[in-house]
Amino acid sequence: MEKKRVVVTGLGALTPLGNTVDTYWDNLLAGKSGADYISKFDASLFKTQFACEVKGFDPLDIMDRKEVRKLDLFSVYAMATTKEAFEDSKINLETVNLDRAGVVWGSGIGGMKTFQDECFNYKDGDGSPRFNPFFVPKMIVDIAAGHISIKYGLKGPNYVTVSACASSTNAIIDALMLIQLGKCDFIVTGGSEAGVNIAGIGGFN
């Protein structure tokens, strides 16, 4: 069986070096560092007090406040980069067979901050099991791919690879193979993580 040719039609980036592909690439070539002192929480008592954070990003630039409340930050990052990639690709989804278009995303830990915040809220409460109804839907790793598919109407394969720091690489490889083998015509792929929080930094310390 002859493998199909695969091309990259659009790119998106939201990184500690820049919030668009062009900014990220320019800063990368300039040798700039994305590391700085942690600003997302008070890390003064932590062994590690620096991290590579995404800077100057406002989720409300890409979705409304009601949507933002339903998503963990790692899913918001996924939606932001996908939006840029679609705009870069200039693909007209009306010309795509959406049954053969899917999402293969990568994330090592998913909604860690959601899990952390819900545990803190329970600990600080009166012991009553009052949890946000979006707790699990925000936290689970595969929800990022789900939100992308829902927004763009993609009805093909939809899943997230979880393999620690190789998660996004594995997602891209899977997406490549799905197209090469003729299973899909079009795949959104990549990865997102939002681990700069108390649980993330404390755990990796």
Annotate each language-model stretch with its function.
Residues 40-91, 141-155:
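A glycine- and small-residue-enriched flexible loop/hinge segment at structural boundaries
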Residues 23, 74-81, 167, 171:
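Generic hydrophobic secondary-structure packing signal
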Residues 2-3, 16-19, 30-38, 87-99, ...:
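Acyl-thioester C-C bond-transforming condensing/cleaving domain
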Residues 1-67:
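ACP-dependent fatty acid/polyketide chain-elongation machinery
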